């Protein structure tokens, strides 16, 4: 019985040892798996942490670059608006300059036509001067004939005067009177010289206004012809008078008184004829001088006109260049508008991409929070599983301790019973049967107790197996959750790569926009230069207008003074006309014509001077435009400095935003570090439990 019991106890011990060995092997296997899984999780978490740190750094960099690009785009838009305003102003100024250029061209055309008219009038006046010379030659020939006739008559009269002393005395008195008349003639010749000087001026003026006064010149020619006729009539009358004198000389004794009166009349007529001849000679000389002066003046005027035409051609070429530059500026403005539209579209796309990136980041943050919550739930479930495992391990240890105690008790009891049996064998061999009965009963009791203990231990083993299965299931669930987290992390990494790629595209687009902005800035500088030139031209044109107004006022005053002088001269000529006969009337008419021509010549001279002043002013306008270009460069530099200051302000705002985002990211990192610490603590506890 003892052997059977020992064998059964050995079997039970073997079973318990096998179960204990199996449980230890399974626990060791599970610990190894759990440690490997925890190590993998730790490596993955470290890699994820590193990747997250890198992604955070790159995210910060890209956000900073994106904000800088947005600031640059805003500044570019502002500069574009200012450039468009400046372009509109330049277009307006260029339009005004074109109008002024057209007016200048019209004035130039008028001056050229006026020059042609003056040249035509000069040629006509030269022809008229030649005709007057021919007429003077004819008059001189007539004068010589008349002088010869007078000499003949004088010879006759001298013969008669020898006979008649009284007539000589009377002739002497007549000579005295003639000398006085010569003095008067000298005075009148001086007045005539002054008149001829005025006539020279008038002829110069007539060179510019001949086309208007051709009819008057023809009338003057008709009057000259009438004067010739009158002179011929007078000459015929003189001849008749001479014949009468000859007849009277034959009858001097009879008609003494008549001869004296006729001689006096003849002397007066002679004096008039000589005076008229001298006046005509002086007039011819003066006309020749006037003609030479007019030729010189015409040559000077032609030289000035040629210079003015050359300068006008240069100015027209410069104006054409300016128009070409204006067309270039207009094309550049259109290009700027198109590029601005492209930039606005790119900016809208970049903003939409940034909004999408922010939305995705927000979704990722929500997913991270959800994963953290799931991780917290898993950690709580893991803690509960650990507590259950610890409880089961404590139960197992208690059962092992109880089994050891029971085995020790049974061994003690068996030893005691063996001793008692041996004592009973030695002492009471009689009581063997009783002891056998008791042993049988004890064996039955032991069997029942062993069966009960076996069942109890089997139930405990099944419970332990169930707890191990539950722990394995929990471990499998943890591995699944870890795999899910790894998949989510891979998805986040892919999403991060996409965001990084989009940010790289945005950076490339920003580089393109920066280059476009630089090109736009260069074009803006050119437009500003053109605008400043136009403004300067406008100011100079206004100054020229004011100067022209002042010049017109001065010319009006000069015209008033000339009118007063004209009235004085007319009064003087009227006095002379009252003194003189038909010849003086003709001179008065010619003087009036000369005065008109002088006024017209002065007006033409003033026009030429104004033309020269306009050309000088155009040169000053050109210089002022160059100065405006320089000032435009300075203004553009100032505008760029202001734009940079505005960009710096926007960058400061964006940096403050980036700092806020960085603070939020650091808080998220801190939370993530805390969760990592909690996971590490849990892993450490799991390892400790597995080691136990």
Swiss-Prot record:
Any Pfam family: Myosin_tail_1
Region (Disordered): 26-57
Coiled-coil positions: 16-692
Classification via Gene3D superfamilies: 1.20.5.340, 1.20.5.370, Vasodilator-stimulated phosphoprotein
Gene Ontology CC terms, in alphabetical order: myofibril; myosin complex; myosin filament
Region (Nonhelical region): 1-15
Keywords: Allergen, Coiled coil, Cytoplasm, Motor protein, Muscle protein, Myosin, Thick filament
Compartment(s) where it occurs, according to its Swiss-Prot or TrEMBL record: Cytoplasm, Myofibril
Main location, first listed in the record: cytoplasm
Family indicated by similarity: Belongs to the paramyosin family.
Function: Paramyosin is a major structural component of many thick filaments isolated from invertebrate muscles.
Subunit organization: Homodimer.
Protein's name in the database: Paramyosin
Organism per entry: Dermatophagoides farinae
Organism ancestry: Eukaryota, Metazoa, Ecdysozoa, Arthropoda, Chelicerata
């Amino acid at each position: 019985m003892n052997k059977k019991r020992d064998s059964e106890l050995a079997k039970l011990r073997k079973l318990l040892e096998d179960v204990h060995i199996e449980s230890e092997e399974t626990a060791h296997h599970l610990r190894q798996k759990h440690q490997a899984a925890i190590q993998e999780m730790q490596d993955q978490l470290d890699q994820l942490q590193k990747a997250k740190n890198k992604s955070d750094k790159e995210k910060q960099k890209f956000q900073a670059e994106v904000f800088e690009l947005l600031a640059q785009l805003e500044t570019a838009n502002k500069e574009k608006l200012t450039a468009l305003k400046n372009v509109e102003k330049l277009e307006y100024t260029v339009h005004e300059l074109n109008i002024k250029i057209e007016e200048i061209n019209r004035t130039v055309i008028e001056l050229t036509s006026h020059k042609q008219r003056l040249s035509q009038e000069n040629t006509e006046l030269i022809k008229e001067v030649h005709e007057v010379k021919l007429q003077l030659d004819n008059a001189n020939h007539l004068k010589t004939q008349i002088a010869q006739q007078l000499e003949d008559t004088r010879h006759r009269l001298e013969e008669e005067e020898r006979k008649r002393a009284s007539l000589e005395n009377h002739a002497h008195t007549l000579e005295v009177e003639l000398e006085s008349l010569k003095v008067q003639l000298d005075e009148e010749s001086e007045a005539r010289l002054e008149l001829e000087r005025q006539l020279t001026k008038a002829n110069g003026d007539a060179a510019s206004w001949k086309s208007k006064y051709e009819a008057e010149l023809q009338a003057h020619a008709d009057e000259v012809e009438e004067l010739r006729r009158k002179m011929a009539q007078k000459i015929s009358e003189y001849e008749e008078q001479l014949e009468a004198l000859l007849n009277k000389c034959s009858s001097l004794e009879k008609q003494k008184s008549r001869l004296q009166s006729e001689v006096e009349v003849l002397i007066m007529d002679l004096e008039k004829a000589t005076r008229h001849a001298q006046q005509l000679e002086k007039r011819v000389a003066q006309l020749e001088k006037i003609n030479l002066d007019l030729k010189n003046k015409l040559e000077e005027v032609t030289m000035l006109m040629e210079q003015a035409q050359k300068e006008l051609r240069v100015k027209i070429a410069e104006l054409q260049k300016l128009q070409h530059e204006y067309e270039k500026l207009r094309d550049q403005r259109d290009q700027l508008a198109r590029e601005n539209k492209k930039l606005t579209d790119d900016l809208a796309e970049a903003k939409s991409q940034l909004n999408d990136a922010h939305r995705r980041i927000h979704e990722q943050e929500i997913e991270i929070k959800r994963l953290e919550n799931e991780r917290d739930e898993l950690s709580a479930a893991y803690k509960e599983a650990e507590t259950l495992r610890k409880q089961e391990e404590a139960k197992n240890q208690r059962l092992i301790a109880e089994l050891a105690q029971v085995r020790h008790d049974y061994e003690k009891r068996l030893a005691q019973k063996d001793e008692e049996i041996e004592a009973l064998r030695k002492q009471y061999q009689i009581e063997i049967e009783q002891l056998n009965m008791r042993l049988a009963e004890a064996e039955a009791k032991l069997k029942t107790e062993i069966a009960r203990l076996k069942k109890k231990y089997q139930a405990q083993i099944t419970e332990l197996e169930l707890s191990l299965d539950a722990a394995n299931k929990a471990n499998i669930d943890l591995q699944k959750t870890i795999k899910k987290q790894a998949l989510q992390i891979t998805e986040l990494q892919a999403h991060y790569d996409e965001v990084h790629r989009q940010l790289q595209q945005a950076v490339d687009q920003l580089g393109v926009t920066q280059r476009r902005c630089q090109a736009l800035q260069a074009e803006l500088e050119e437009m500003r230069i053109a605008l400043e030139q136009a403004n300067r031209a406008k100011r100079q044109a206004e100054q020229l207008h004011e100067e022209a107004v002042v010049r017109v006022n001065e010319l009006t005053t000069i015209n008033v003074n000339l009118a007063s002088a004209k009235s004085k001269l007319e009064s003087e000529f009227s006095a002379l006309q009252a003194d003189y006969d038909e010849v003086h009337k003709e001179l008065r008419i010619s003087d009036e014509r000369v005065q008109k021509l002088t006024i017209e010549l002065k007006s033409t001279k003033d026009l030429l001077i104004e033309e020269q002043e306009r050309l000088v002013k155009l040169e000053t306008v050109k210089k002022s435009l160059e100065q405006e270009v320089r000032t435009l460069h300075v203004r553009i530099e100032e505008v760029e400095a202001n734009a940079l200051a505005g960009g710096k302000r926007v960058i400061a705002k964006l940096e403050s935003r980036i700092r806020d985002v960085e603070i939020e990211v650091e808080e998220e990192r801190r939370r993530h570090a805390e969760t990592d610490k909690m996971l590490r603590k849990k892993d450490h506890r799991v390892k400790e439990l597995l080691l136990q």
